[in-house]
């Protein structure tokens, strides 16, 4: 009997009978996966999770609202305990392709992007069914196009703009905007950002740029200023700084016998990724001029202990420069600290130094907010958008070259009244913390209620 039925009719019957199977099982499996009863967000950073503080703050803030957070990125160091111990946050470790000599940098970049594409697709397939995906930009390639494609599952896209990826690449190619790789990066950011449901920026200047240059919807763009998280606090008044310096395991080995903060010796700190947009040479040059001032003009200048935290491609170069110089009044230490010890170090310092200049001229260094939260006035390299954060002689000092930095260091080291004024203003500034600022911005975007 079945043999007499036309093939087209048999196919139609099979198709008709398979509709419930497709609708109730296949489509939910493909697009929703293990859909959670909680609101669920994927947070993606193509960087080290433990040293991506703003991304970690996002994860913690969503978790506090009861959301299920899927935090994706490289885990190259110990995760902050507040992340690893949070039952609402699941960390997904991505493998990172490391360069092992041989081959040109362009070939390696292509291999790395292809490796990232496969890794991201695999991970997003496992996490399908999420309500939102938040990606950090930069980098934009390959995560931004993939995140836009992921919207087909019904997921809404949030881009957290830390900077412009093409501007960082442009810096690498000596400012050449028309280099093919720079143009590709620019087009990827401009085109795919239009598909975002929400855009968060770190400055008002960046928000205006995205609206005017990328023609993004103003209603979908909001400024979420970096603010210090709760772990960044000034040193409690009942704790002796000198005692802490000589007893805390993470720092005591750097404190020489003749160094005494109670006798006026000072500690400064800078955090850096040792990239071209942060010239550590300016700080080293200023400290050399300080040394010269001590020898030739003012023997009353206090000792300076300078901590340089972080790691990156130019670190070895600067370490060698420090080793080759005969320091008499300054001691410079390169350190790499855990997420728990870094706030403790800031508590013990007098001033923070920021050498960030911004490849785009539109972002702000988060390290300054960490320093403010710890009660540190900041001596910062000046560029136009910095006015959104640092006001000269109010909550910090500004400079444009090593000589101005040297002059700022002299004022900072010797003028106790200036220090007290700056510290008071910084303490007031730091009262506005991340969580309250985050919730206010998210409500304005109607992301939360």
UniProtKB/Swiss-Prot annotation:
Catalysis performed (reactions): an N,N'-diacetylchitobiosyl-diphospho-di-trans,poly-cis-dolichol + GDP-alpha-D-mannose = a beta-D-Man-(1->4)-beta-D-GlcNAc-(1->4)-alpha-D-GlcNAc-diphospho-di-trans,poly-cis-dolichol + GDP + H(+)
Sequence motif Dolichol recognition, location on chain: 21-32
One function term, GO molecular function aspect: chitobiosyldiphosphodolichol beta-mannosyltransferase activity
GO BP annotations, alphabetical order: dolichol-linked oligosaccharide biosynthetic process; protein glycosylation; protein N-linked glycosylation
Pathway annotation from the record: Protein modification; protein glycosylation
Residue spans crossing the bilayer: 8-28
Effect of residue 310 to D: Abolishes enzymatic activity
Keyword Nucleus tagged: no
CC per GO annotation: cytoplasmic side of endoplasmic reticulum membrane; endoplasmic reticulum
Residue spans, topological domain Lumenal: 1-7
Residue ranges, annotated region (Required for oligomerization): 435-449
Gene3D superfamilies according to UniProt: Glycogen Phosphorylase B (3.40.50.2000)
Keyword Disulfide bond attributed: no
InterPro entries: ALG1-like (IPR026051), Glyco_trans_1 (IPR001296)
This protein's UniProt keywords: Endoplasmic reticulum, Glycosyltransferase, Membrane, Signal-anchor, Transferase, Transmembrane, Transmembrane helix
PANTHER family xref list: BETA1,4 MANNOSYLTRANSFERASE, CHITOBIOSYLDIPHOSPHODOLICHOL BETA-MANNOSYLTRANSFERASE
Function as written in the Swiss-Prot or TrEMBL entry: Participates in the formation of the lipid-linked precursor oligosaccharide for N-glycosylation. Involved in assembling the dolichol-pyrophosphate-GlcNAc(2)-Man(5) intermediate on the cytoplasmic surface of the ER.
Miscellaneous information on this protein: Present with 1890 molecules/cell in log phase SD medium.
Record protein name field: Chitobiosyldiphosphodolichol beta-mannosyltransferase
Organism: Saccharomyces cerevisiae (strain ATCC 204508 / S288c) (Baker's yeast)
Source species taxonomy: Eukaryota, Fungi, Dikarya, Ascomycota, Saccharomycotina
């Amino acid at each position: 009997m079945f043999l007499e039925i036309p093939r087209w009719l048999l196919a139609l019957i099979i198709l008709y009978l398979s509709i419930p199977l497709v609708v109730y099982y296949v489509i939910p499996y493909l697009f929703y996966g293990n859909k959670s009863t909680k609101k669920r967000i994927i947070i993606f950073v193509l960087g080290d999770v433990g040293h991506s503080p703003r991304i970690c703050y996002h994860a913690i803030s969503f978790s506090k609202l009861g959301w299920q957070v899927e935090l994706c990125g490289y885990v190259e160091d110990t995760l902050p305990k507040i992340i690893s111990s949070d039952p609402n946050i699941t960390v997904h470790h991505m493998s990172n392709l490391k360069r092992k000599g041989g081959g040109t940098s362009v070939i390696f970049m292509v291999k790395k992007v292809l490796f990232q594409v496969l890794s991201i697709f695999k991970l997003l397939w496992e996490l399908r069914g999420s309500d939102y995906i938040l990606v950090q930009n930069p980098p934009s390639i390959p995560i931004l196009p993939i995140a836009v494609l992921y919207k087909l599952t019904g997921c809404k896209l949030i881009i957290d703009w830390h900077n412009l990826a093409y501007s960082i690449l442009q810096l690498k190619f000596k400012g050449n905007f028309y280099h093919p790789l720079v143009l590709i990066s620019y087009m990827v950011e401009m085109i795919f950002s239009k598909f975002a449901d929400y855009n968060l920026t770190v400055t008002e200047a960046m928000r205006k740029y995205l609206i005017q240059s990328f023609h993004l919807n103003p209603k979908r763009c909001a400024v979420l200023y970096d603010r210090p998280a709760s772990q960044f606090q000034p040193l409690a008044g009942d704790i002796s700084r000198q005692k802490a310096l000589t007893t805390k395991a993470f720092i005591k080995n750097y404190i020489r016998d003749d160094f005494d903060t109670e006798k006026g010796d000072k500690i400064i700190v800078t955090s850096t990724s040792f990239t071209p947009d942060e010239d550590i040479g300016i700080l080293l040059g200023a400290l050399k001029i300080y040394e010269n001032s001590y020898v030739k003009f003012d023997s009353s200048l206090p000792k300076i202990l300078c901590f340089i935290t972080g790691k990156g491609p130019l670190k070895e170069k600067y370490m060698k420069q420090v080793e080759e110089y005969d320091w008499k009044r300054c001691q410079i230490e390169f350190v790499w600290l855990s997420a728990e010890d870094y706030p403790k170090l800031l508590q013990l310092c007098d001033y923070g130094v920021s050498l960030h200049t911004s490849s785009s001229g539109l972002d702000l260094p988060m390290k300054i907010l960490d320093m403010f939260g710890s009660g540190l006035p900041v001596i910062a390299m000046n560029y136009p958008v910095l006015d959104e954060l640092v006001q000269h002689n109010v909550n910090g000092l500004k400079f444009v070259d090593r000589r101005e930095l040297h002059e700022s260091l002299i004022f900072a080291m010797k003028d106790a009244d200036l220090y007290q004024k700056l510290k008071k203003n910084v303490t007031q500034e730091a009262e506005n913390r991340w969580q309250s600022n985050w919730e206010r911005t998210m409500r304005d975007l109607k992301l939360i209620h």
